[in-house]
Amino acid sequence: MLNSLDLEGRPQDTRVVVAMSGGVDSSTTAALLKAEGYDVVGITLQLYDHGAATHRKGACCAGQDIHDARDVAAKLGIPHYVLDYEDRFRESVIDNFADSYALGETPVPCIECNRSIKFRDLLKTARELGAQALATGHYVASRRLDDGSRVLVCAADADRDQSYFLFATTQEQLDYLRFPLGDMTKPETRELARRFGLAVADKHDSQDICFVPTGRYTDIITRLRPNAMDPGDIVDLDGRVLGRHNGIANFTVGQRRGLGIAAHAPLFVVRLEAANRRVVVGPREALKMHRISLRDVNWLGGGDIDSAIGNGLEMFVRVRSTRSPQPAWLRGAGGHYEIELVAGEEGVSPGQACVFYDAPSGQARVLGGGFIQSAAAKVASNPARPLVEAVRG
């Protein structure tokens, strides 16, 4: 008989490691599992410790958050460990973040953190502790199939859904992970935290880039990859120089504000050319892309991705975390994959993720995804014809 986590055995005989960041979500996750009788072990990762960040509202995995996680664990009466992952985090996440901006991309550090720190290194530690599962406070859900494997689905709370940031989770990792908050709303989580008497019940949510102490990501870029802040030209689609900029890392595709140039009509960043330090701008209609080339594709749709695609697989894709899934076709084989957007999308930026879903809304299944490498404005009439790239990473 399976318990509430779809695992064999009674809760009291089932050890679960909970990744505790010190926030309300992971704290409530630990409290829920403890209340259900599981053998809960809390682990908090020390990822960075900028002096300015440790007491900032919304900081994560440093300073005050570690103390909050320790206090919650003490109240729940569960073992709690703090692991120093600063070196791993710097190498896998912060350096990657800076490199991506230097290439003219707009990275999503949370994806890399989940992929390389939480769901690889921490998962390994959980296994070494004899845990049958690793639970997190993410707003996403998983469902058990008849064969025992699991599928990733969107959270019940669409406003909090974090599936975009978890597309790179492997099937092996997914089978070991549990997301107890996936069918709850944020207000319900906070109310539960109050019932459990957790001091973090009304704590502010974490920020998008937890390791940026001042809120200015360019400070990190300037320190780690100063060449990304070298000045260069702002040009139009025909290459005419319209002005100068103070570093491509200050811009992202689709940006309108802060260009510092005068024009009769609104201009937007269409692409960033890192090799020659050029920011290319154009009218809004130049932003719409219809074809996306992907790298590092992760498939969660079951079976072999090439077999699933065949001559083309219809799906829905999200090209930014704040966007709604849009109809698209996935094509390709042998590690080379492209997305054809039925209606096109604006602001498609290299470095962002393109996440696959089987439905446009509700608790849709996550089929995987990849990182955007380049994009083109029009779909070629001949599939074998090379892309004329409009956006290049």
UniProtKB/Swiss-Prot annotation:
Site description Interaction with tRNA, residues in chain: 138, 352
Region (Interaction with tRNA): 160-162
Disulphide bridges: 113-210
Record carries keyword DNA-binding: no
Family annotation (SUPFAM superfamilies): Adenine nucleotide alpha hydrolases-like
Subcellular localization, as worded in the UniProt entry: Cytoplasm
Primary residence: cytoplasm
The entry's keywords: ATP-binding, Cytoplasm, Disulfide bond, Nucleotide-binding, RNA-binding, Transferase, tRNA processing, tRNA-binding
Group of enzyme by EC: transferase
Residues where ATP binds: 19-26, 45, 137
EC number, as in UniProt: 2.8.1.13
Family listed: Belongs to the MnmA/TRMU family.
The protein, known as: tRNA-specific 2-thiouridylase MnmA
Species for this entry: Bradyrhizobium diazoefficiens (strain JCM 10833 / BCRC 13528 / IAM 13628 / NBRC 14792 / USDA 110)
